[in-house]
From Swiss-Prot:
First-listed, main subcellular location of the protein, grouped into a coarse class: secreted
Intrachain S-S bonds: 1-7
Family: Belongs to the calcitonin family.
Record's GO cellular component terms: extracellular region
Compartmental location: Secreted
PTM sites of type Proline amide: 32
Role noted for this protein: Causes a rapid but short-lived drop in the level of calcium and phosphate in blood by promoting the incorporation of those ions in the bones.
UniProt protein name: Calcitonin
Stored Pfam families: Calc_CGRP_IAPP
InterPro entries per the UniProt record, alphabetical: Calcitonin (IPR021118), Calcitonin/adrenomedullin (IPR021116), Calcitonin_CS (IPR018360), Calcitonin_peptide-like (IPR001693)
Entry keyword set: Amidation, Disulfide bond, Hormone, Secreted
Organism, as annotated: Anguilla japonica (Japanese eel)
């Protein structure tokens, strides 16, 4: 990664999305 801040922010956002989709699988099933 060229920019550490951007890389970290990207990974953090992905992790947050995963964490948010896990407990709400029944609400939005199949939606990314």
């Amino acid at each position: 990664c060229s920019n550490l801040s951007t890389c970290v922010l990207g990974k953090l956002s992905q992790e947050l999305h995963k964490l948010q989709t896990y407990p709400r699988t029944d609400v939005g099933a199949g939606t990314p």
